[in-house]
Curated annotation (Swiss-Prot):
UniProt entry keywords in alphabetical sequence: RNA-binding, Transcription, Transcription antitermination, Transcription regulation
Function: Involved in transcription antitermination. Required for transcription of ribosomal RNA (rRNA) genes. Binds specifically to the boxA antiterminator sequence of the ribosomal RNA (rrn) operons.
One MF term in the entry's GO annotations: RNA binding
Pfam families found in the cross-reference section: NusB
Protein name according to UniProt: Transcription antitermination protein NusB
Amino acid sequence: MKTARRRSRELAVQAVYQSLINRTAAPEIAKNIREMSDFAKADEELFNKLFFGTQTNAADYIQKIRPLLDRDEKDLNPIERAVLLTACHELSAMPETPYPVIINEAIEVTKTFGGTDGHKFVNGILDKLAAQIRPDEPKRR
């Protein structure tokens, strides 16, 4: 059974994905997500922080992610891009969540929505990103 926090992360990634694909305004996307039947199982506060925070800072997050990629960021699968952006926000703005939890959750969300080996790609990028964003925390491994 998925936790409310996992469901919030999944919904936030779906919302970011919609914004990447449809270019719909964030409030409209959030409204549509909240109307989904299983939104009641999510942590609404976490969803709001993840989705709106990612939307607000997406350009900055792309700048952090771009040097770590082995391809042009425009060639990223939209699901992988949405997962990376959302996890980058969580790493950057939510220090109360340990980075291994953020990476693991991103891997699980990618397994749910992404391609066959997308989770391996996401894991590699987020591991490097965590070392940059939280330089003191990864030393505690």
